[in-house]
């Protein structure tokens, strides 16, 4: 028993020491993390949808979803709001993510999660696919109004493989070049469509190679930015619709 307690104390000590060794991000880095993990909240039937979500409780499979009769009673725009602000599937990641130093100076290989320990169910992603044109139009409408692309919108764009929205996203990005995750969306679209010039590049190998992980990134600088924009524009022009 004493040996077990000693072992547990040693593990706890190592965990605390590991936490102490993490780099302490700057205020600018922390502010950017808040910026890039923020979801866009559509206004369509928002109070009604939020009231419905507030009454949900998870079932035995840790799924929090509206009963079919309630979901089917929603208009398309209300369903858009529901799906954009609520992930139905519980998918806890047991490994805590360490703080990221200089997050604002990186272009990441992957997007951050929109719903912490939850994610979209197959039914929810199917809604995006089945109503693709309407979903893209509503995303554009919302982004034009709010001047930002929430992480949930980015995830939906990648999920739908919405290549047709590339010119719009580029226009949004070029306004202030603040949201580097728009560049990540471009990378993910080129990857999903197996765009050969990108697959053959050194940046692809670094971002999505065997050693890549959730935090893999390249440095945000003018050269990398311009290369991504050039590649995604070439990809878009040659994309077979």
Regions found by a protein language model. Give the residues of each.
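Extended repeat-based scaffolds of very large eukaryotic assembly and lipid-transport proteins
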Residues: 19-152, 191-241
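Hydrophobic core positions within HEAT/HEAT-like alpha-solenoid repeats
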Residues: 154, 186-187
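Short amphipathic alpha-helical surface patches that serve as generic macromolecular interface elements
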Residues: 166, 183-186
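Alpha-solenoid HEAT/Armadillo-like helical repeat scaffolds in large eukaryotic proteins
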Residues: 138-142, 156, 168-176
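Core of folded catalytic or high-affinity ligand/protein-binding domains
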Residues: 148-159, 163-165
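Bacterial Sec-dependent N-terminal signal peptides
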Residues: 1-28
């Amino acid at each position: 028993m004493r040996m077990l307690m000693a072992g547990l104390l040693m593990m706890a000590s190592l965990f605390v020491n590991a936490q102490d060794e993490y780099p302490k991000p700057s205020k600018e880095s922390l502010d950017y993390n808040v910026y890039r993990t923020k979801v866009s909240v559509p206004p369509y039937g928002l109070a009604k949808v939020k009231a419905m979500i507030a009454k949900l409780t998870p079932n035995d499979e840790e799924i929090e979803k509206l009963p079919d009769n309630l979901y089917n009673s929603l208009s398309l725009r209300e369903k858009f709001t529901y799906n954009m602000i609520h992930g139905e599937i519980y998918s806890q990641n047991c490994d805590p993510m360490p703080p990221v130093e200089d997050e604002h100076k990186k272009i990441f290989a992957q997007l951050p999660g929109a719903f912490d320990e939850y994610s979209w169910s197959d039914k929810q992603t199917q809604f995006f696919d089945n109503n693709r044109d309407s979903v893209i139009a509503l995303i554009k409408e919302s982004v034009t109004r709010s001047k930002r692309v929430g992480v949930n919108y980015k995830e939906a764009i990648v999920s739908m493989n919405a290549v047709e929205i590339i010119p719009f996203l580029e226009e949004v990005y070029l306004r202030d070049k603040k949201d580097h995750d728009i560049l990540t969306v471009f990378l993910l679209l080129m990857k999903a469509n197996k765009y050969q010039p990108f697959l053959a590049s050194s940046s692809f190998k670094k971002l999505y190679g065997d050693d890549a992980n959730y935090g893999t990134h390249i440095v945000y600088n003018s050269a990398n930015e311009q290369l991504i924009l050039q590649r995604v524009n070439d990809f878009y022009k040659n994309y077979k619709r």
